[in-house]
Regions:
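N-terminal low-complexity, Pro/Thr/Ser-rich intrinsically disordered segments
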Residues: 1-18, 161-187
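Second-shell loop/turn segments in exported
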Residues: 12-19, 91-99, 176-182, 233-240
Length: 319
């Protein structure tokens, strides 16, 4: 099993349109010319570019007294120069590792590796893929909607984007890795915690709450027993989704604990299991088309899948 190891991100990877944190406004002007709007306060200068080719806002920290630039025991020194860049349109603007707006989310994670955080705006159904630089003093935040990069920001890391935890690596886990759509297994279920449910299906003593992009199985004690993705507009905590090639999943998660290989048949599927070290019997499972190697299902389970080859049985929704 060949597993690509994401290369380490470097400070030079953290840029938007060639602008890095700490760059001068002179450099910004040399790249993009005079701004459409210009505003200066005591501490910051903001330049806005609004044209047919680009929409971008650059915020820079003005120069200040040398003593304020020094880092002391109880405070960080002020960093002058560009502090943040926000790009909302511009098909030719390159950022990160050769990325552009409208590129697929799968290309994003293949180029940038494992996100340090993935957040979801449940109301707008927008995901934010967060990458922090090795020094932990800068972050790139990619807004993903309809499976594509819609916006990107370069800014200092701060909550809720930065969690202050160790950056994730292959085969090293946090409890967050064994959640799906915000749900943990064997925890009390709250129906409208993130989204309004669309449909409720009963099977024996369990309820299946179906949302637009995912479903949740709940037992008679109102405890979550299974979570599964229904569309390719939903992502795991490491940015994986339906429709990804298995090589992308392996680059994000590393070597699985086990693989269940299906028969040699036209619609046969295999299952890649990642077992939680935090909850016995809990696994994150990627179901992959045996021939094409693309992900067909993602499930967080607490009991074995009874019939892997039957899509409805995988969910537990067989008649």
């Amino acid at each position: 099993m060949d597993i690509a190891v994401p290369s380490v991100l470097h400070a030079g990877d953290f840029h938007v349109g060639g602008i890095h944190c700490g760059d001068s406004l002179r450099k910004v002007r040399s790249l993009y010319g005079s701004p459409t709007k210009y505003a200066r306060s005591a501490h910051y200068t903001t330049m806005q570019y609004d044209g047919k080719d680009i929409a971008m806002r650059v915020r820079s920290r003005n120069d200040t007294a040398d003593i304020l630039k020094e880092t002391g025991e109880e405070r960080e020194g002020v960093r002058i120069g560009v502090e943040s860049v926000f790009l909302t349109s511009g098909k030719d603007a390159v950022f990160g590792r050769g990325l552009r707006l409208k590129m697929p989310a799968e290309v994003l994670v293949r180029q940038m590796g494992i996100p340090s955080n993935v957040l979801r705006d449940a109301d707008a159904n927008i995901y934010y893929f967060v990458y922090e630089n090795p020094a932990r003093d800068g972050a790139m935040i990619f807004a993903v909607a309809n499976r594509k990069i819609e916006r990107v920001a370069l800014m200092p890391p701060r909550p809720p984007y930065s969690r202050g935890e160790a950056l994730p690596v292959q085969n090293k886990w946090s409890e967050r890795d064994f959640t799906l759509m915000g749900f943990s297994l064997n925890q009390p279920f709250q129906a409208n915690k993130y989204n309004m449910w669309n449909n409720l299906v009963k099977r024996d003593s369990n309820n299946f709450w179906l949302y637009g992009d995912y479903g949740v199985e709940v037992d008679r004690r109102n405890m979550v027993q299974k979570v599964f993705l229904l569309t390719n507009n939903a992502y795991t905590s490491r940015g994986a989704a339906l429709g990804y090639h298995i090589s992308t999943v392996l680059s994000l998660y590393g070597r699985p604990d086990r693989v269940e290989v299906g028969p040699e048949a036209e619609k046969s599927v295999d299952a890649y299991y990642y077992d939680s070290p935090f909850q016995k019997g809990v696994s994150l499972v990627f179901v992959v088309n045996h021939a094409s190697r693309y992900v067909e299902d993602v499930l967080l389970i607490s009991a074995p899948i009874q019939n892997l080859q039957d899509p409805m049985a995988r969910y537990g929704l067989q008649s």
